[in-house]
């Protein structure tokens, strides 16, 4: 699930993490995979459409962005990404900054969705084993906030937080 999984799990369970480091994560399923012209939408009954919309609402990461209030975020995005276009990462950055949340944004101009360049030290791919991201994450600590707001969609999925 990559960047999408990072956003989804991190924003649904913010107390489990000290920070988030999504890479190429989409903002909302409706933008990533438009469904307006799909035959299943055009020919479905209103009842089916309503059920489908309710099920898909949980895939709207922007709805849950408020849950990042106490999570520092480092976003990495390839500027040449055609799988998850950079507009998603830029939107996250902008919305986090508007809220005064802690966000670092890295848009790599010559990179696409994935790159296999080796790290300068040791093995692995720089796409995953990036020194800047790892150092950012090592500096973070989970702290109990004095106050918080949580945005939930389904209490049966995430109704407990360590704070």
Place the predicted regions along the sequence by residue.
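Short, solvent-exposed turn/loop segments enriched in Gly/Ser/Thr/Pro and often Arg
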Residues: 1-3, 23-26, 109
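Short glycine-enriched nucleophile-adjacent loop
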Residues: 3-14
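Mobile cap/lid helix-loop segments that gate and shape the active-site cleft of serine hydrolases
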Residues: 12-66, 70-71
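Hydrophobic/aromatic beta-strand patches that form the interior of the parallel beta-sheet core
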Residues: 21, 74-76, 106
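Active-site neighborhood of glycoside hydrolase catalytic domains
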Residues: 58, 70, 88-102
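Short beta-strand/loop motif that positions the catalytic acidic residue
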Residues: 68, 74-77, 81
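Conserved alpha/beta-hydrolase "acid-adjacent" motif
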Residues: 82-88
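Alpha/beta-hydrolase-fold serine-hydrolase catalytic core, especially in secreted/extracellular enzymes
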Residues: 94, 98-163
